[in-house]
């Protein structure tokens, strides 16, 4: 009898192994098919859809020749012709944690449903402490939503960031990288006010900090302690990036997260602590983004809008009292 049980168990394990191998081969085959199809379509050259000369009043190109997206510099229709044929899916992840307001989340998703990647497949990922206080969210066509409960506990603000990014790392590795071609991670206390389209897509996407864009690099609040992982010297640096929006391919977003987690671990070894935003700035100082979003994508409406900003794309939500 024992022999039969062991034989049956071995057979079941063999079947599971075969199914796993088949799934892996199918997944690899689908990825290769997409890569092959993508490679047969020539991606538009930068000069065919982006013209920095149309905005001489702003920094429209970085020192490493990445476009800084301002209203008037890009032609979305050229890129639409390319991405429509690829039938891409874009992910938008948001954390609903701590003292977040369900009304703020509802406003954010409602605005994203209206303006984020219109005409493309979009998956909204909500990572929450729990789902009991999440609002009802009605979505349009080509939009789906997934909710995940965050695992782990946090004690401080930075512990919360670390917990969030650990969860995001796991979800990218286990799910997201197989579901979307591009991924954005945003904070829920924003609202999208104008079209957030395919001009923002790229291998890695960084958001300029609206306040620090108008300051000199020496004034930027980089990590200045030499022993800290996020250290950037006073004579170095080009931009200061905001943590409210980050994007790219799932694997590039994963690389950023792993850089942050490693930096946190290294700092704790040296009894140091730094913010997620400073680690993010160190990452983009080392690995330059291929798309940079202007302050139009990160504006605080409490401040007077400067003439450089023609159309606010993303704004901070007013605090709900």
From Swiss-Prot:
Could you say which cofactors this protein requires? Mn(2+)
Q: Name one GO biological process term.
A: carbohydrate metabolic process
Record membrane topology: Single-pass type II membrane protein
Cite the annotated pathway.
Protein modification; protein glycosylation
UniProt keyword Cytoplasm present: no
* Cytoplasmic face residues: 1-6
GO molecular function annotation: glycosyltransferase activity; metal ion binding; N-acetyllactosaminide 3-alpha-galactosyltransferase activity
> Residues that bind substrate, according to the entry?
95-100, 187-189, 209-212
Its EC number(s): 2.4.1.87
UniProt cofactor note: Binds 1 Mn(2+) ion per subunit.
> Which residues have a glycan attached per UniProt?
87, 99
Q: Which InterPro entries does the record match to this protein? A: Glyco_trans_6 (IPR005076), Nucleotide-diphossugar_trans (IPR029044)
What cellular-component terms does GO give this entry? Golgi apparatus; Golgi cisterna membrane; vesicle
The miscellaneous remark of the record is: This gene is not expressed in humans.
| Domains: entry comment | The conserved DXD motif is involved in cofactor binding. The manganese ion interacts with the beta-phosphate group of UDP and may also have a role in catalysis.
Similarity annotation: Belongs to the glycosyltransferase 6 family.
Q: What is this protein called?
A: N-acetyllactosaminide alpha-1,3-galactosyltransferase-like 1
Organism, by scientific name, is Rattus norvegicus
**Lineage start:** Eukaryota, Metazoa, Chordata, Craniata, Vertebrata
